[in-house]
Regions:
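Non-catalytic, solvent-exposed segments at the cell envelope interface
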Residues: 1-308
Length: 308
């Protein structure tokens, strides 16, 4: 957190310099150069370089608001509590997947401390209020008469869904404390494990990896997650409750201990997951929420006027 704190004030300067480089390189007309010289793809390389620099300049500009908040987000000076939601994209919902499990973690001056890790039904079991199911639930789930927390991500606008979810979640007897919500789907652990390689998870035998599993012709971690999460509760109750937290913990620990050469890959995973809505953020604090929206990480729907 202290290192980030030193970096944050430099972001404006770094962004301005990168913008100057982008402006300069964008003036280069690649069509004035031959396609190849001695077997080297000159024109194609220039085009790719221009696109890369332009993308970096744009990304850094979008990241500035959130980077300036990073010390605070990493628990400096005060600890920050995060609620992780797992969206199972094999069962589609408006925000990206069925809300299957949740976990909590606390970050204090950059140090991550795991909290609880539970099945989403644990949260619902503590929610005793009878809220009539809205029309979409009644239409597609006719035997569900009440609106459960697990079904409250009805709006494709993530903030709207989380406003609803958190409003009612407060009434659950087991509602966790949080400063922010981070929702991920199966694509996030797959991408991270492609960089990390197979990792162990405390309390579970074997390894979790992104390698293809012939049982599903999909990444092994997806098979294991869905196998554990979708089994009937009476068969594997403890597994359902605990898989998300330990898996995320193990991945975070392995990422933090990775060589610096891999950090760029993790950064790319983070940015691509945000761009493709595999990772979504929701903050209680308005300034942090606005920063997440500027980054494109808040899953907001944008209304365009005619002519835009």
């Amino acid at each position: 957190a202290e290192t980030v704190e030193k970096l944050a004030p430099e972001m404006d300067n770094i962004s301005a310099k990168l913008k100057q480089v982008d402006d300069a390189i964008s003036q280069i007309d690649e069509n004035r150069y031959p396609k190849t010289i001695n077997g080297m793809n000159v024109r194609e390389n220039i085009t790719q370089a221009k696109a890369t620099v332009s993308g970096l300049a744009s990304s850094l500009s979008n990241f500035q608001p959130i980077v300036k908040l990073l010390p605070d987000l990493l628990g400096n000076p005060d600890p920050r509590k995060y609620l992780l939601l797992f969206q199972n994209d094999a069962e589609l919902r408006a925000t990206g997947g069925f809300l299957t499990a949740y976990a909590t973690l606390t970050i204090t001056k950059g140090k991550i401390e795991p909290g609880i890790s539970e099945d989403i039904y644990t949260l619902d079991n503590g929610f005793k209020k009878k809220v009539p199911a809205p029309d979409p639930i009644k239409k597609y789930l006719p035997l569900v008469y009440n609106w459960n927390l697990r079904d409250m991500n009805l709006s494709p606008d993530f903030k709207v869904s989380m406003d609803t979810f958190t409003t009612y979640m407060r009434e659950s007897s087991v509602a966790p404390e949080y400063d922010a919500i981070i929702a991920i789907d199966t694509e996030v652990p797959v991408r991270i494990l492609k960089v990390l390689g197979p990792i162990g998870v405390s309390g579970y035998g074997g390894k979790f990896s992104a390698e293809n599993d012939p049982r599903c012709d999909c990444p092994q971690v997806i098979y294991e997650l869905e196998n554990i999460i979708t089994k009937p509760t009476y068969e594997i109750r403890e597994g359902r409750k605990s898989i998300l937290g330990p898996l995320m913990n193990s991945m975070l620990a392995n990422m933090m201990g990775s060589p610096k050469a891999k950090w760029a890959e993790f950064f790319n995973i983070f940015t691509e997951s945000i761009e493709q809505k595999h990772l979504l953020m929701y903050f209680k604090d308005e300034n942090k929420q606005l920063a997440a929206e500027a980054l494109g990480a808040a899953g907001r729907l944008t209304t365009y006027t005619e002519g835009d």
